[in-house]
Amino acid sequence: MIGLFDIQTEIDKDKLEYIKENWQGAEYCEQCYAKHSRQMPYSYKDLIYKDKDEIVEIAHAATYYIYLNRDMATGNTEIDDGALVALLNRDINFAFDESTKTLTKQGQGLGFLNAFIKEKLLSVTVANKGPRTVTDRMQDMKYLYKVVRKAMAMKTDLTITRLFSTAKIVDGQSVSNFRPMASAYLMHKYGIWANPDKDVLNFWIPSEGWLGRLLSSYYTAYKNPDKQINYISTDPSGDVVSSFWEVVEYLSNFGGIHKVKNWSADIRQHGSDVPEADFYKNEGKKFELIWTSPPYSLGFEKYKDSYIIKAIDESGNGVEITDSKGNYLSEELVLDCGKKVKRLRSGDDFTYNGHKYRLVSKRNLGQSHSKASSNYGWNEVFFRPTVKNAKSNLADGGTMIWNVCDVRTHQTLEADVVRICQEEGFTLKDTLKYELSRVPGGILQADGTRKSLRELKKPFEPVFIFNL
């Protein structure tokens, strides 16, 4: 109950419940938007004293507002050279707080990467949250109404930016990117500074993800022109691989005073847990630094599958089908014959890039989430084989780094990773903190109070440092 002289600071809980119970459909959203469009976007403080019927109108209007602007969810798709230059000019020491052993929130470089990855990143299915991606859900006005209601409960303004941020956490979770500056600090501390006498340094990233570490390796080479930085990563996602090569091509041609000549980058389209990822056994390669931040839980990320396709060409020769860059073909690729790759069956005739083939076999590259049915299984199918490969690949005196965090669906992940690494012969030398970004606002509790996300979850993730 609000007293006569009390100042109300939030929307009443009963109004939020009233919004929840009064979804009136897409047509009503359009009608309400026509009525309220001149006032959009509403700030949170403008909503506090609205009566329950008007606030329901505003919720419907905001739903149509976000629907109209849904294409903006991918952000700026133009390549931002300024963001790249800002990263290259940033001092590496700003990325780490020595007193708290924390990799701090330094977002330089993410704006540059967004032009290459944002649309694909939003199209990644979060497998343990259902089959729909963030992009899919942006077409559903009933879902967007729920987003608006959630934003009000979190006490945020109904701006496009705030609504898009909220959409990522309603009935799902979008995949995040590791900040390039934080990764660059790890490359400096455990790569450059730990090996002052080496002119050539090799880094392996077992799970590439969305290219934050790739960009940090470019930064590291730029800041250390006397060192040759060779970067190799692995990832089964065709979307990641194609974006990887787009970024590499762009950076390789980036010139002027920021030209980098002491850097090479390569990616292999397979997991870190397969025999092909034992680079020492297969290619004689050793790495001074191995580090990754993999999917945190069984089924967390579900990318479009890719396939290893073996076929017979018109001359009767056995061939393996890849695209022009040597990448395996995505399940959604439409072949010249009009059939998608995922629909091919053994013995099918098909045409690709103007050449005729007959399919002999098609093997799904697979992802860890599809290989096991429990967290224990995923530990043994993915983590342990990856650690075994890392042990084979690590140079004498090298460092292996894991950034993981306990999550609802795998509540012992941190302990499991440390245990498995120790069982395979590694020693835990240090633990750093990776400072997390925060969604503004608060979460409504059952008793009607609100708690900030910082109160509900620790504001950092551990970064485990291992040596042999």
Question: Model regions: which residues?
Answer:
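Class I S-adenosyl-L-methionine-dependent methyltransferase catalytic core
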Residues: 1-83, 89-468
